[in-house]
Amino acid sequence: MEELEQDLLLQPWAWLQLAENSLLAKVSITKHGYALLISDLQQVWHEQVDTSVVSQRAKELNKRLTAPPAALLCHLDEALRPLFKDSAHPSKATFSCDRGEEGLILRVQSELSGLPFSWHFHCIPASSSLVSQHLIHPLMGVSLALQSHVRELAALLRMKDLEIQAYQESGAVLSRSRLKTEPFEENSFLEQFMAEKLPEACAVGDGKPFAMSLQSLYVAVTKQQIQARQAHKDSGETQASSSTSPRGTDNQPEEPVSLSSTLSEPEYEPVAASGPMHRARLVKSKRKKPRGLFS
């Protein structure tokens, strides 16, 4: 199920309007099962099931219908796709949800092979680790990315001001006075933004502005974070493997190495490890007086 969890992390948040309920949700459906995450900006709910649960629940909700888990999951994907990813083509299925103390139930009513098909997603409160993975860490990354983006734009504006100044010093004159601008002052700009634009810019509302405007950046940030974690994991495994791997020369005494012999013999030719001739060569090499760099 690790593949399913990672795929869910890479999915953007979608804004859903179900009757009077405004929700943010993301879903991943594969041949192995599905994972669903839903939030009303007050709580976060989650469900992840495999094919065995899909088969059992389908039998309980649809007595007349028999289908393999792969077909059921494919149908659920087709029913949810317009709701989550293609709002221009409304889904033929109908959706509703109920919230209770124990969790949230998302109900789906559709048709499969000409027969009524019903499905219930039974979501329970998400763990703190899931909330951190899908909201806290990605949103912190998005904030840092946007801050870096603003700094890059500010640096570009300062370069533009220097370019305009160079044109003016060379005698260039602006033909349209209405296009004239003042040199960019970052601190003044930030102060004005905080005072005039911030209340409107940070209005979260029902989550729709976030889901509609920052999907691509959210996915890019989560992908980068997954790659960073994987690289860190691989590095740790490599270090652990190198520290525990046996060394064949640990129990052998170190012999002094002659720098001159090393320079004169750049290529190492392996020889047989047995036989009297080999032992004689070893004994002879030990009797040599090591030669230093200045000897």
From Swiss-Prot:
It comes from the Eukaryota. The modification Phosphoserine is found at residues 132, 245. Residues 237-251 have a biased composition (Polar residues). Residues 228-295 are annotated as: Disordered. InterPro entries: NHEJ_factor, XLF-like_CC, XLF-like_N, XRCC4-like_N_sf. The record marks 115 as: Leu-lock. The modification Phosphothreonine is found at residue 262. The keyword Coiled coil applies. Residues 278-295 have a biased composition (Basic residues). Homodimer; mainly exists as a homodimer when not associated with XRCC4. Interacts with XRCC4; the interaction is direct and is mediated via a head-to-head interaction between N-terminal head regions. Component of the core long-range non-homologous end joining (NHEJ) complex (also named DNA-PK complex) composed of PRKDC, LIG4, XRCC4, XRCC6/Ku70, XRCC5/Ku86 and NHEJ1/XLF. Additional component of the NHEJ complex includes PAXX. This is Non-homologous end-joining factor 1. It comes from Mus musculus (Mouse). The lineage of its organism: Eukaryota, Metazoa, Chordata, Craniata, Vertebrata.
